[in-house]
Swiss-Prot record:
Keyword 4Fe-4S: yes
Similarity remark: Belongs to the IspH family.
Cofactor: record remark: Binds 1 [4Fe-4S] cluster per subunit.
InterPro entries with a match to the protein in the record: LytB/IspH
UniProt xrefs under CDD domains: lytB_ispH (cd13944)
Cofactors that this protein relies on: [4Fe-4S] cluster
Record-linked NCBIfam families: ispH_lytB (TIGR00216), PRK01045.1-1 (NF002187)
Signal peptide extent: none
Top EC group: oxidoreductase
Protein name according to UniProt: 4-hydroxy-3-methylbut-2-enyl diphosphate reductase
The protein's role, per its UniProt record: Catalyzes the conversion of 1-hydroxy-2-methyl-2-(E)-butenyl 4-diphosphate (HMBPP) into a mixture of isopentenyl diphosphate (IPP) and dimethylallyl diphosphate (DMAPP). Acts in the terminal step of the DOXP/MEP pathway for isoprenoid precursor biosynthesis.
Amino acid sequence: MKIIKISPRGYCYGVVDAMVIARNAALDKSLPRPIYILGMIVHNKHVTDAFEEDGIITLDGPSRLEILDQIDSGTVIFTAHGVSPEVKQRAKEKGLTTIDATCPDVTKTHDLIEAKKSEGYHVIYIGKKGHPEPEGAVGIAPDIVHLIEKADDLKTLEIPTDKILVTNQTTMSQWDVQHLMEDIKKKFPTAEFHKEICLATQVRQEAVAKQADVADLTIVVGDPKSNNSNRLAQVSQEIAGTKAYRVADVSEIQLEWLQGVEAVAVTAGASTPTPITKEVIAFLEQYDPTNPATWERKRNVPLQKILPRVKVKKQ
């Protein structure tokens, strides 16, 4: 069986930066304890489990404000997905020490919304409902930001001005965003468009579109909560025309997927640890459908191999 290692794949700079910030926080003895992450620092359970070993507590919930209500003291890390000004203000009022690990690409979108609000615009924001990134973006100016996920959401959308900005969640499918923007243009012809798909998301999606088309199957390594991982599977199926499955790690691979497969493409979401992806590739490289000894799918990557190394500062 031929293995096509799609490149680029895996970690983006925003994810690595967020994890380094959190690791440095764990090593900083001057920070008030306990240290919490407000939601998953990045959408990967292997990463949050590894941080738990570092003594950092991940709290998750339906909204950042509701999670914050669980915290009375200590240090709070804001995740790569960004948070609203209301969350930052509430943390300040509670006397919490805060560390901001927001991805710079997300901050760029927040700044754009702020600027357009001051100019009297309304904003149509294309994003996935229930995902923390749109929650933070809408929270920048909830009175003028309108979240839409699908074309159907446009049917009931009314905006009381011709000054309209259209932007989006950074990890959406670029093709979905483009189609929605075309629909928006028909309904709101005066709208201005700022496509904010981050470069890492864009090049990973384009790599799948161009490289997975010669495979019989694509395996995307990524957490079920990772929007960019789920979008990679979508791109494989809808753009490359190759059936795709998303797995959190090697243990989730089903042998029946591999029946009759001569070429399998492998990629990984931007929040997927490299050792987890390497383990999937190693399994596929040694897999022999006629030899049961090669069929075991067990995750063996130790948690201490998940997080990036950081230099310990001398006291």
